[in-house]
Amino acid sequence: NPRQIHIQHALGYPPLEYAHLPMVLGPDKKRLSKRNAVTSLQDYFDQGYLESSMINMLARLGWSKGDKEIFYLDDLISDFRIQEVQKAGAIFDPSKLDWINNHHLAALSFDDFKNRLIPFLDSLGLDYMQKQNSSEIIAAMRSSKPNLLGVAQDLIPYFSELSSYDDKAANKFLIGSEVVLEYVQRKLNGLEDWNEDSIDKALMEAQTGLSLPTPKLNQPIRIAMTGSTQSPSLGLTLSLFNLEEVNKRINAALKYLFDTN
């Protein structure tokens, strides 16, 4: 800064105080660069990280306040002191950003969360308006991923036709599950009330009737409904679809198994 200081003196400006922030490092403790990490704020926003999360993350690089990790703008305005920033390199850990963003997303009201999510649903071509229970589906899935794009991608099976199954999941749990699918389908079709509690009861009865451990019963059904082994509790997952759609997807899974054999 010597040149700037001389110019300030020559112009008669009062001397400024300078502060240096620590160098930002990647998880490998090498200087963060485009070659080993996403370095554009816009790229993070495009993935559905909140502005408040990025401010939180960046403010914590080289600065801390006890063991507190989650800060909102008002917190930082009152707590942040540039004098407390350390000189040593600060690590930008994407997994920590995920954790911080999870907290900031959870703090949003449902309406705020949904409004922020909608552009990501639109970008994936998901017609969420066709579902009368779209808000219920979004509420069930809102914590499935640490960013809005990930949540939107997880919602694809709920707002569009299921076109494929995860290969690894299908090979591990779906192949050979014809008896499970047919047995559970009969149980579900015998329900008088279609809600999470009644579905859970039917699943428990099916598990007892087939003498199977939970994964052997639940995962084939979960894959048939969503294409993967990742979803909320199975009773809740099934309740997000109507019985007609459940039958359609179980029948499609049975056809897939028949064609595979």
Features from the language model and the residues they span:
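Amphipathic alpha-helical interaction elements
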Residues: D46, N102-A106, D122, L126, ...
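Short alpha-helical scaffolding segments that buttress acidic/His motifs in well-ordered protein cores
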Residues: M57-L58, I100-N101, I138-K145, A152, ...
